């Protein structure tokens, strides 16, 4: 059985030979393993990024590859030509900010002047991009999408791995775009003060993301992850989730599934109070399900509540188990997760959220051995 077949069976609630294993990796963790690669090259260059993902899959013997960035510019060296290399970092200078790159984390944007966010009333929806041309990665960090070269990275990966491994794409929730547009505090206040305008903005981004996801489905991928890290209890109530997240992510999921691909939601932190709401979206699967103390999900309870409605991808604690744990404690925790997760199928072993930058690679290498020994059906 190929790795791809294994993942497809798990996502479809059929029984593979064993539990598949496939983790999302933080950019920092990737770069920690790719010692000789410039973090700037890894971020901006499609071929460097693709080759890095392929190498890391081989290093950890994962059954699939998640492609979290797409739309690289072929002429990125000309666009980002103001570049400084220092002993411990690289800096790319842009018009309004500089991006500081290290091999330990995401690029860090440092604005020359204090960043000022528009108020909800100042937003003219007609001026927002009709076509999604950026990914709001984190805290003012955008990854620009070349609209003439949106999906080259998928072709580069598929040319080298073929149908052997499951390739997954990624898009970002409309809720993230709203938060990025207005700033976190301003956006959360706007949900209360001007909910209808927020919904208009959310629908605008939903239209663009649905189109982007639908186009992505034409590539050689099996699933698309919808990154929605701010939709947990740490940010919004279940009531606001139902009003400002669920209707919009549901549309994107519908667009993906209409193309014959799987869709799964990635929401960090505490989601125990909204598991049933999340599956109302029609999602094929849920990723993360962070255990305490990072979140509040008990895997056995989640399996009972979710039943055969969605597959689960999770839920190893990347910090307390993989980063701070000993190899012995990692083994104990992961065996327990495999035992619970594999019950009735529909399970992919993964970290709850991404592999933290400083997690020892030896701990990640244990995962393949553990599913081989304890994850057999």
Predicted stretch roles:
Residues 46-48:
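Loop-to-helix transition at the N-terminal end of transmembrane alpha-helices
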Residues 22-30, 64-74:
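Ligand-binding clamshell of periplasmic/extracellular solute-binding protein-like
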Residues 67-81, 173-175:
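Short, glycine/charge-rich beta-strand/loop segments that flank catalytic centers
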Residues 1-42, 52, 117-377:
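Active-site loop segments of alpha/beta catalytic cores
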Residues 50-68, 215-221:
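Catalytic domains of carbohydrate-active enzymes, especially glycoside hydrolases
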Residues 74-138, 163-164:
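A contiguous, low-structure linker/loop signature
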Residues 56-59, 81-85, 157-160:
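Short, charge-rich binding segments
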């Amino acid at each position: 059985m190929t790795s791809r077949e294994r993942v497809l069976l798990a996502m479809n609630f059929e029984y593979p030979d064993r539990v598949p294993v496939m983790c999302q990796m933080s950019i920092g963790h990737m770069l920690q393993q790719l010692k000789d690669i410039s973090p700037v090259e890894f971020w901006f260059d499609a071929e460097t990024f693709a080759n890095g993902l392929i190498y890391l899959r081989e290093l950890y013997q994962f059954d699939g590859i998640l492609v979290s960035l797409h739309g690289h510019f072929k002429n990125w060296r000309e666009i980002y030509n103001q570049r400084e290399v220092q002993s411990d970092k690289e800096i790319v200078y842009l018009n309004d900010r500089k991006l500081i790159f290290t091999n330990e984390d995401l690029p860090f944007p440092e604005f020359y002047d204090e960043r000022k966010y528009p108020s909800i009333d100042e937003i003219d929806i007609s001026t927002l991009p009709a076509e999604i041309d950026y990914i709001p990665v984190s805290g003012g960090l955008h990854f620009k999408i070349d609209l003439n070269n949106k999906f080259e990275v998928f072709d580069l990966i598929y040319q080298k791995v073929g149908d052997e491994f499951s390739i997954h794409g990624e898009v970002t929730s409309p809720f993230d775009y709203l938060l990025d547009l207005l700033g976190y505090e301003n956006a959360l206040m706007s949900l209360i003060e001007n909910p209808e305008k927020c919904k208009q903005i959310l629908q605008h981004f939903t239209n663009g993301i649905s189109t982007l996801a639908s186009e992505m489905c034409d590539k050689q991928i099996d699933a698309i992850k919808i990154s929605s890290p701010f939709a947990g209890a740490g940010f919004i109530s279940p009531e606001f989730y139902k009003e400002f997240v669920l209707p919009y992510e549901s549309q994107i999921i519908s667009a993906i599934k209409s193309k014959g691909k799987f869709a799964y939601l990635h929401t960090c932190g505490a989601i125990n109070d909204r598991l049933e709401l999340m599956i109302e979206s029609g999602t094929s699967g849920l990723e993360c399900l962070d255990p305490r103390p990072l979140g509040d999900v008990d895997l056995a309870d989640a399996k009972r509540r979710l039943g055969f409605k969605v597959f689960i991808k999770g839920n190893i604690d990347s910090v307390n188990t993989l980063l701070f744990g000993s190899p012995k404690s990692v083994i104990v925790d992961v065996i327990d997760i495999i035992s619970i997760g594999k019950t009735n199928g529909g399970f992919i072993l993964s970290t709850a959220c991404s592999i933290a930058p400083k997690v020892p690679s030896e701990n990640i290498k244990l995962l393949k051995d553990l599913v081989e020994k304890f994850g057999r059906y």
